[in-house]
Amino acid sequence: MNDNIARKMQQTYNIAYWGGSYYYVNDLGNVSVCPNPDLPGAKIDLAELVKRVQQEQKHLRLPALFCFPQILQHRLRSINAAFKRARESYGYKGDYFLVYPIKVNQQRRVIESLASSGEPLGLEAGSKAELMAVLAHAGMTRTVIVCNGYKDREYIRLALIGEKLGHKVYLVIEKMSEIAQVLEEAERLNVIPRLGVRARLASQGSGKWQASGGEKSKFGLAATQVLQLVETLRAVDRLDSLQLLHFHLGSQLANIRDIATGVRESARFYVELHKLGVNIQCFDVGGGLGVDYEGTRSQSDCSVNYGLNEYANNVIWGIGDACDEHGLPHPTVITESGRALTAHHTVLVSNVIGVERNEFTQTTPPAEDASRPLTSLWETWQEMHSEGNRRSLRESLHDGQLDLHDVHTQYAHGMLDLTERAWAEELYLNICRRIQQDLDPSNRAHRPIIDELQERMADKFYVNFSLFQSLPDAWGIDQLFPVLPIEGLDKPLDRRAVLLDITCDSDGIVDHYVDGDGVAATMPMPAYDPDCPPMIGFFMVGAYQEILGNMHNLFGDTAAIDVYVFDNGEVTYNQSEEGDSVADMLQYVKLDPNVLMARFRDQVKGADLDTGLQEQFLLEFESGLYGYTYLEDE
């Protein structure tokens, strides 16, 4: 495979833009991973890596997550560097801390890889369980802990204990009823609390996650409540405890203008609080830093029209400008950029278990006494091959669709038999294929027809995974994730395909794909080789997907492999997750595997079977109980 073909593959799947320099197509036509773009020699062929791990770890079965902790650390360095440049550029005198909200991915490998990176990093918790995880890892970072979410007294006490241990723990007030509990528990523990307030802004981002920001958001205090909080603290001489201002515009903000507008409004809260005598020291802009899942660099829901540097510049300039205008000190800026930290670092790899393709047969004329829809279809087919054809491609397609609809209607009323219906459907497929061959992708008028026919004619690839477990946001909120074969891209991409999972649910299908023209309903694929089926990679699944995945059809967590790539060519890995067994999933729903085994054994013993067959059936059942929930190769 030469460089020209490699470049073409980069464009075909838009990988050059969504890959973030971490993923690219190599000269062999396989996807390569470069976990640290600052060390371009430290790279690994993903397909070869999967095969190596399968060979060395005989028990490993696909699907499996391949995780690259070095990407996490590079993302952390990149975000910190962007804010350092912005502060230097605008003469910003305050500090900056990136805080990781662990709800994005609470896996141990993620928290420990980030906390042990040597980079400044804070941690954020939104529940008691998360706070316990954060406190246990806080000794590795020694910076900032932000406590969000609704809180009971136990949550509050844990946070105050963290303060007592020497951490900077900010209890962010989300509702007015929390403040009395915080003050009471702080007095009992003899701790001066560090408080934050989450202000509910009028500004709101757009997109799939817009409800998490704005005036109707679930969390935060309205302007009147912020004033009440200030007076409550002033009355008990605890105004100095209120040190952090927090706001949240929304997750995955696509438009930089929304970010700039939100920062400008929140900066007014900072100014007004100082006028009230509140010495706010930290300005937490929350989440919102998005990633470009589709690589279009646009304002669409799964893209962003800005980069790290522009984001940092807008945040730092917006806050600094308001401070300078009113002669106020520059606060420490905090961002909670969990998605931007984690999305790139994980790839789900799985195997294709089967393909359903349209088969094109030799066309034959209908019977002389065939019904009108059948003869009309044949006339359309013949006219398409005649030199004097005056029908447009669109007209031929519409005529064929109308005739096929009439065929289905007549079949439903018993006027046509199954053979006639099958003949009509095969001829219609041939008409569609002929129209496809004559369409010109550069003709804008042809694009809707091309898209329609690609979807109609696409191969169905059945992939060994659960959309609901591994890509829950693709099902739940129609989020797009980059998907492509991780091998065989040196072959012509002369097919279009859709991917279906193995659940018994019609929603288990990937509806949207990234290609060179943006987003499409099908994906380009090489011709399917049953002797060497391709492995499929689902990219940028490191944020939220692992923790949101559900157990539909009792498909469980997949295996996970942590991979480290070094510039001397060395590659090491360890399997951090075994993947759920059938027994694991049954126990989740309170079905005891031992009880099931005993009941099945009773049935087998009571059946009229010879001893050898009984033992075989029992062994098969027991083996299945402790096997992988996904389809396993023999």
Curated annotation (Swiss-Prot):
GO terms for biological process: arginine catabolic process; putrescine biosynthetic process from arginine; spermidine biosynthetic process. Pathway: Amine and polyamine biosynthesis; agmatine biosynthesis; agmatine from L-arginine: step 1/1. It is an enzyme of class 4 (lyase). Pfam families: Arg_decarb_HB, Arg_decarbox_C, Orn_Arg_deC_N. It catalyses: L-arginine + H(+) = agmatine + CO2. Keywords: Decarboxylase, Lyase, Magnesium, Metal-binding, Polyamine biosynthesis, Putrescine biosynthesis, Pyridoxal phosphate, Spermidine biosynthesis. Its EC number is 4.1.1.19. The modification N6-(pyridoxal phosphate)lysine is found at K103. The keyword Magnesium applies. Substrate binds at F283, D284, V285, G286, G287, G288, L289, G290, V291, D292, Y293. SUPFAM superfamilies: Alanine racemase C-terminal domain-like, PLP-binding barrel. Its cofactor is Mg(2+); pyridoxal 5'-phosphate. InterPro entries: Ala_racemase/Decarboxylase_C (IPR009006), Arg_decarb_HB (IPR040634), Arg_decarbox_C (IPR041128), Arg_decrbxlase (IPR002985), De-COase2_CS (IPR022657), De-COase2_N (IPR022644), De-COase2_pyr-phos_BS (IPR022653), Orn/DAP/Arg_de-COase (IPR000183). GO terms for molecular function: arginine decarboxylase activity; metal ion binding. Gene3D superfamilies: 1.10.287.3440, 1.20.58.930, Alanine racemase, Lyase, Ornithine Decarboxylase, Chain A, domain 1. Belongs to the Orn/Lys/Arg decarboxylase class-II family. SpeA subfamily. Catalyzes the biosynthesis of agmatine from arginine. PANTHER family: ARGININE DECARBOXYLASE (PTHR43295), BIOSYNTHETIC ARGININE DECARBOXYLASE (PTHR43295:SF9). This is Biosynthetic arginine decarboxylase. The gene is speA.
